């Protein structure tokens, strides 16, 4: 007999209460269970000692706590850490931890590949395979938090020092094109019985899916970042193809609406600096006009070159001059420090070692090698003896 176990990482707080109700348990059991999973990193029901044995026995036959398997783990010379994560069928995504003084930021993925296909992003050149499940999204945070604690010898649980203080959905994929799993994962990040992160410390980055920006403002408004990268529609149409469907004026209006519900009083506009493409003083002046009615700040991102792009990075003097025009116009502007270049973890390089859809057979062979070395993937249908 083949039975599909329920992966409890897929359930938000309300869903976990409902699931426990189906097992004949009261709501407080769901909160206990949630704390064991998300605060203590437990994956063994027998370790959950304050749960009744009868409940633990039920869970062992009906449920699992299964994050995606880690294929590889690399640490950069600057402390940035990147995990390559197996999401099945020859697909992998990447999760990146960026340590800074008094904070630790985790960059997570929401899709295997990306359909938006921005010209300057290597992930989009790999094609789109599928959306990630809730468990595959929140599982990145679950895995990273407790792996970082284990590395440092920090105990699990709320008394242990939290390693991840900020989460950014800026990895592989467009979060708003995988809406329901993304929002469920966000709710878990914010819940006090799970990770308890402030809405101000969780940022969702989008290329500009206007209707879903409006929906997010009602369902789970977190800090918003927008991948802008151009100062006019003609330029953005070529860099971010989604702009043809949701042009800049519609996007700016959506950003203004979002701020009525957002935890921060500004939108962050991300702008990849491309030599001779979008980096002139005139482009900067156009930006000042474009965003004049949107409270915002700019984050200028030095481009990370890859062979298929045909693009090059703006030099440092040009980036600084561009930033100065924006600052002279009254905009808070930062220049992102590149991190993790030596392990291909920098922004735009999250293409994965096995995610090239143009070489399916090679990819599947490579994944089979990883499976043989690191063990069978988690999160699959499990055979239970009848």
Swiss-Prot record:
Reaction equations catalysed: adenosine(2503) in 23S rRNA + 2 reduced [2Fe-2S]-[ferredoxin] + 2 S-adenosyl-L-methionine = 2-methyladenosine(2503) in 23S rRNA + 5'-deoxyadenosine + L-methionine + 2 oxidized [2Fe-2S]-[ferredoxin] + S-adenosyl-L-homocysteine; adenosine(37) in tRNA + 2 reduced [2Fe-2S]-[ferredoxin] + 2 S-adenosyl-L-methionine = 2-methyladenosine(37) in tRNA + 5'-deoxyadenosine + L-methionine + 2 oxidized [2Fe-2S]-[ferredoxin] + S-adenosyl-L-homocysteine
Cofactor names: [4Fe-4S] cluster
Binding locations of S-adenosyl-L-methionine: 173-174, 205, 227-229, 304
Domain Radical SAM core residues, every copy: 100-341
Gene3D superfamilies with a match to the protein in the record: 1.10.150.530, Aldolase class I (3.20.20.70)
Signal peptide region: none
Positions that bind [4Fe-4S] cluster: 114, 118, 121
Note on cofactor: Binds 1 [4Fe-4S] cluster. The cluster is coordinated with 3 cysteines and an exchangeable S-adenosyl-L-methionine.
Disulfide-bond pairs as recorded: 107-347
EC number: 2.1.1.192
A Pfam family hit: Radical_SAM
UniProtKB keywords: 4Fe-4S, Cytoplasm, Disulfide bond, Iron, Iron-sulfur, Metal-binding, Methyltransferase, rRNA processing, S-adenosyl-L-methionine, Transferase, tRNA processing
GO-annotated biological processes: rRNA base methylation; tRNA methylation
Described purpose of this protein according to its UniProt entry: Specifically methylates position 2 of adenine 2503 in 23S rRNA and position 2 of adenine 37 in tRNAs. m2A2503 modification seems to play a crucial role in the proofreading step occurring at the peptidyl transferase center and thus would serve to optimize ribosomal fidelity.
PANTHER family: 23S RRNA METHYLTRANSFERASE, RADICAL SAM CORE DOMAIN-CONTAINING PROTEIN
Note: Reaction proceeds by a ping-pong mechanism involving intermediate methylation of a conserved cysteine residue.
Protein name per the record: Dual-specificity RNA methyltransferase RlmN
Source taxonomy: Bacteria, Pseudomonadati, Pseudomonadota, Betaproteobacteria, Burkholderiales
């Amino acid at each position: 007999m083949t039975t599909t176990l329920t992966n409890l990482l897929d359930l938000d707080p309300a869903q976990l209460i409902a699931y426990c109700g189906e097992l004949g348990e009261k709501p407080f059991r769901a909160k206990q269970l949630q704390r064991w999973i998300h605060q203590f990193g437990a994956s063994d029901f027998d370790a959950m000692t304050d749960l009744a044995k009868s409940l633990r026995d039920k869970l062992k036959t009906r449920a699992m706590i299964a994050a995606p398997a880690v294929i590889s783990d690399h640490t950069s010379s600057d402390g940035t850490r990147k995990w390559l994560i197996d999401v099945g069928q020859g697909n992998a995504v990447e999760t990146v931890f960026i340590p800074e003084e008094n904070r630790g930021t985790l960059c997570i993925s929401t899709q295997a590949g990306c359909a938006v296909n921005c010209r300057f992003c290597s992930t989009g050149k790999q094609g789109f395979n599928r959306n990630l499940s809730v468990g595959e999204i929140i599982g990145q945070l679950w895995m990273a938090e407790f792996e970082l604690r284990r590395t440092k010898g920090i105990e699990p649980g709320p008394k242990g020092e939290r390693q991840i203080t900020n989460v950014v959905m800026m990895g592989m994929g467009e979060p708003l094109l995988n809406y329901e799993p993304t929002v469920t994962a966000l709710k878990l990040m914010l819940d006090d019985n799970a990770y308890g992160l402030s809405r101000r410390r969780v940022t969702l980055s989008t290329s500009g899916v206007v209707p879903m920006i409006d929906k997010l403002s009602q369902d789970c408004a977190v800090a918003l970042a927008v991948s802008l990268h151009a100062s006019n529609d003609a330029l953005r149409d070529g860099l971010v193809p989604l702009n043809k469907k949701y042009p800049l004026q519609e996007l700016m209006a959506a950003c203004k609406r979002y701020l009525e519900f957002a935890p921060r009083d500004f939108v962050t506009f991300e702008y990849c600096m491309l030599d001779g493409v979008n980096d002139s003083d005139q482009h900067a002046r156009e930006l000042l006009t474009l965003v004049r009615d949107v409270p915002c700040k700019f984050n200028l991102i030095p481009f990370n070159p890859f062979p298929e792009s045909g693009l090059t990075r703006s030099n440092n003097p040009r980036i600084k001059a561009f930033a100065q025009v924006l600052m002279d116009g009254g905009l808070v502007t930062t220049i992102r420090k590149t991190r993790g270049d030596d392990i291909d973890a920098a922004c735009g390089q999250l293409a994965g070692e096995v995610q090239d859809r143009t070489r399916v057979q090679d990819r599947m062979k490579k994944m089979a090698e990883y499976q043989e070395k690191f063990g069978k993937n988690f999160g699959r249908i499990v055979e239970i003896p009848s």
